[in-house]
Amino acid sequence: MSKQKNDTFLRACRGEKTDYVPVWYMRQAGRSQPEYRALKEKYSLFEITHQPELCAYVTRLPVEQYHVDAAILYKDIMSPLPAIGVDVEIKAGVGPVIANPIRSLADVEKLGEIHPEEDVPYVLETIKLLTTEQLNVPLIGFAGAPFTLASYMIEGGPSKNYNKTKAFMYAEPKAWFALMDKLADMTIRYVKAQIRAGASAIQIFDSWVGAVNVDDYRTFIKPTMARIFAALREENVPLIMFGVGASHLAKEWNDLPLDVIGLDWRLSIREARERGITKALQGNLDPAVLLAPWEVIEKRVKQILDEGMEQPGYIFNLGHGIFPEIQPETLKRLTAFIHDYTSRK
């Protein structure tokens, strides 16, 4: 039986009133904690995620240290790709590198299917361990969105402009949509398995979708996202969408059958609502602010919280993931401040 007690995050996802604003941080598991850095001297990311006890420990750390209102599973958006035949390596200082980039419809057709219980049992075991024994807050499962995964698979690694990805999308639409379908099927199976193992909410990360304009999003990406969220909706857990530099797509996300839209710092909470966004909102402090003096942090955070609390259905987060230079003590202090400031309003 789950020991989960604090459901403030889940209630905010559903647009309900809460006693205070819940908070969690993207990339809170790992990154800046000294305990995590010590582990990374011994193990790679994939080695940690393949060991449920170790992975659960890393996932649990920020809940215990920062007192956040939700945990997010420690893993990478690339984690399910080897199961469908993608040779991926996370290289230090570079990021994911793909040995066999997609170049044609034939390459797409070679991709297999994921069977989560057989291909990623360690992910499901970690979730079960956390949700039945260790956490008193909800656990967020997650996956990468097809566009972002496809961009790595086509570019062969990180990119600054996604030229190869967009060229493939424009020049090879049949292959593009075949790839979207393969990745959508993988995402649906992978995420449903996480939910059935015990994840209480799901976030879909479309990290690089800001590279496309609205028309291209509607044509080449949105139908796939609609299919994914419609399938996940059957599991009856809150669904969150997040992308970087993608404020121009927020209205498109608002059409999808999801619960929460995560914003980066380029679009304010108030402006999002003025644009007609009706979903619950999550965000959106620029993580770079956390390197500034506390008085600067507090001023920026108050402004975001004041806007967020204008309506129910708000979760505080960063506008992107924590980076290693951010001090754990800053995050602990920030969480306490958010809880205190919003519980007095």
From Swiss-Prot:
GO biological processes: protoporphyrinogen IX biosynthetic process
Domain of life the protein comes from: Bacteria
GO molecular function: uroporphyrinogen decarboxylase activity
GO terms for cellular component: cytosol
Enzyme class: lyase
Reactions performed catalytically: uroporphyrinogen III + 4 H(+) = coproporphyrinogen III + 4 CO2
Residue(s) at site: Transition state stabilizer: 76
EC identifiers of the protein: 4.1.1.37
Residues given in the record as substrate binding sites: 27-31, 46, 76, 152, 207, 320
Xref: HAMAP family: URO_D
NCBIfam families: hemE
Function (record text): Catalyzes the decarboxylation of four acetate groups of uroporphyrinogen-III to yield coproporphyrinogen-III.
Protein name listed in UniProt: Uroporphyrinogen decarboxylase
